[in-house]
């Protein structure tokens, strides 16, 4: 596991083996889920087991969870090596790929951003609690240090 504060819950499906992969980027996404209450990050594993998608990590209000069994030798399917229909891909499309990027999913909430429980929202209308954002920042710092990832190589939500 990447850090003692991270829960290790490895996936056995929807991951690919790549021995000694080079990690250059950090991508942060959101789950578009119903809430960020404690335990939701761990529950996200079941979603990834059913879909042809995955992420290296997921965070909620309490937990940071690692789904990638071995960051040095496996990659998850989160960054979008293929363009979605009607999409031009992101700014780093074709540069930051599943093979060279670590992905973090932040559990989002449907609570309106005007609620006192939520202080962050994104352009798609999903909201994030301070606790979930703080866990994403904490995990990002751990990963950036461990893999020498410059802040210019980190995506935004």
Locate predicted features:
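Active-site-adjacent loop/helix surface patches within enzyme catalytic domains
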Residues: 1-150
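Short, glycine/acidic-rich hinge or "gate" loops at secondary-structure transitions
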Residues: 149-157
């Amino acid at each position: 596991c990447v850090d003692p504060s991270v829960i290790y819950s490895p996936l056995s499906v929807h991951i690919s083996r790549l021995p000694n992969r080079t990690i250059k980027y950090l991508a942060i996404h959101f789950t578009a889920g119903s809430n960020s209450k404690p335990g939701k990050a761990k529950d996200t594993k079941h979603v990834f087991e059913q879909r042809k998608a995955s992420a290296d990590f997921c965070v909620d209000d309490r937990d940071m969870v690692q789904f990638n069994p071995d960051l040095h030798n496996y990659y998850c399917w989160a960054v979008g090596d293929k363009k979605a229909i009607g999409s031009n891909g992101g700014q780093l499309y074709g540069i930051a790929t599943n093979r060279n990027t670590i992905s973090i999913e932040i559990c989002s909430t449907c609570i309106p951003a005007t609620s006192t429980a939520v202080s962050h929202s994104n352009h798609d209308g999903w909201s994030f609690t301070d606790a979930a954002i703080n866990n994403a920042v904490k995990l990002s710092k751990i990963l950036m240090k461990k893999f020498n990832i410059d802040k210019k190589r980190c995506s935004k939500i």
